[in-house]
Amino acid sequence: MLIDQFDRKINYLRISVTQRCNFRCLYCMPKIPFDYQPKENLLSFEELFLFVKATIDEGIEKIRITGGEPLLRKDLSIFIKMISDYKSDIDLAITTNGFLLKDFAKDLKNAGLKRLNISLDTLDHKKAKTLAQKDVLDSVLSGIDEALNLDLKVKLNTVALKNLNDDELISLLEFAKSKKAQIRFIEFMENTHAYGKLQGLKRDEIIQILSQKYQIQLIKKDEKAPVSIYKADDYEFGIIDPHSHEFCDSCNRIRLSAEGLLIPCLYFDEASSIKEAVRKGDIKAAVEILQEVLRNKPEKNKWSVVDNETSSRAFYQTGG
């Protein structure tokens, strides 16, 4: 079992398999980065799996594959199959922008994937092109339909932004309901790589907008994640509210970057590399590095909205 210095059980591993993305979303990576790691600096899927297997043995129960855009990484379905074959009942999911999903959904399902989180910030073609700086909406919607047709469980993620999609929150909720998918509205998390003029909606503002049409009722607050579950009449949706709901006391996650950096907290600059240990085949040493990272995992993040601090680490490097 993995326990940090504050007696928190760590059972959730988020793996960023690539920094690259085919969108240039205003809230994440509006400009082409100059800090992409060359391919040789990235851990191969075989190397990643050696470490992942060890973390499962140590108590990891949930794995989320992220990016960048994970579907840009060649042979991702092979990596999914490695994990699924090793532990078929592990909670294994991918977060994707959905653009390539129509082409890859079947392979992912056959590899053992059961769940997807898909970004959907707007149903308007013009706004989608503004947000992603690319004409993406038709491909994303096709990807969502393909995943649902294959009986993959789908959650839709919407970053709620003032003057961009705040007039669509009800429409997005109703779209998700029509697809029998759960939507989760996300408070914008400030970071130094985002477009500087963006302003996000807070939880209460999201609820206020949805309340214009629906009776909103809080039904569940997950203490191990910054998500609260609500009902709009008979439909359940989520709000991921890091501004409004501090969950550090029960944080259960650790992050691994594509180049082998173990990151204890999204808003914490320190990180430790397992690359050398893994490439030497010394998985015991890699696990010891993981345990040391957990001993140094902070009690709380260093994000202070009052002081207008932002994350200096790019979310496309850590998967958000």
UniProtKB/Swiss-Prot annotation:
Pathway: Cofactor biosynthesis; molybdopterin biosynthesis
Reaction it catalyzes: GTP + AH2 + S-adenosyl-L-methionine = (8S)-3',8-cyclo-7,8-dihydroguanosine 5'-triphosphate + 5'-deoxyadenosine + L-methionine + A + H(+)
Pfam families assigned to the protein according to its UniProt record, in alphabetical order: Fer4_12, Mob_synth_C, Radical_SAM
Protein name, entry field: GTP 3',8-cyclase
Subunit-structure text: Monomer and homodimer.
Record bears the keyword GTP-binding: yes
Cofactor note: Binds 2 [4Fe-4S] clusters. Binds 1 [4Fe-4S] cluster coordinated with 3 cysteines and an exchangeable S-adenosyl-L-methionine and 1 [4Fe-4S] cluster coordinated with 3 cysteines and the GTP-derived substrate.
Organism phylogeny: Bacteria, Pseudomonadati, Campylobacterota, Epsilonproteobacteria, Campylobacterales
Binding site for [4Fe-4S] cluster 2: 248, 251, 265
One Gene Ontology biological process: Mo-molybdopterin cofactor biosynthetic process
Organism name: Campylobacter jejuni subsp. doylei (strain ATCC BAA-1458 / RM4099 / 269.97)
Binding site for [4Fe-4S] cluster 1: 21, 25, 28
GO MF term list: 4 iron, 4 sulfur cluster binding; cyclic pyranopterin monophosphate synthase activity; GTP 3',8'-cyclase activity; GTP binding; metal ion binding; S-adenosyl-L-methionine binding
The EC number(s) this enzyme carries: 4.1.99.22
Entry keyword annotation includes Protein biosynthesis: no
PROSITE patterns on file: MOAA_NIFB_PQQE, RADICAL_SAM
EC primary class: lyase
Annotated disulfide bonds: none
